[in-house]
């Protein structure tokens, strides 16, 4: 199981009420998790390894 799958499944189990969504771009995937007045982005490479995190807000 890749880091991407592990983290995605963990959030789904712990916070099933959150609307977690994913976006696939050329060569990478991101998971977006609501947090405060923004969201946390977890970016993974093509092999499912976590490569970057960001807090996005208006």
Task: Please provide the spans of the model-predicted regions.
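N-terminal acidic leader/helix
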Residues: 1-28, 56-58
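Detector for the mature cores of small, proteolytically processed
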Residues: 27-58
């Amino acid at each position: 199981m890749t880091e991407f799958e592990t983290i995605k499944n963990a959030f789904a189990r712990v916070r099933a009420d959150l609307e977690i969504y994913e976006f696939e771009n050329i060569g990478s995937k991101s998971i977006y998790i609501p947090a405060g007045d923004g969201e946390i982005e977890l970016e993974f490479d093509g092999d499912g390894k976590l490569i970057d995190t960001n807090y996005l807000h208006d």
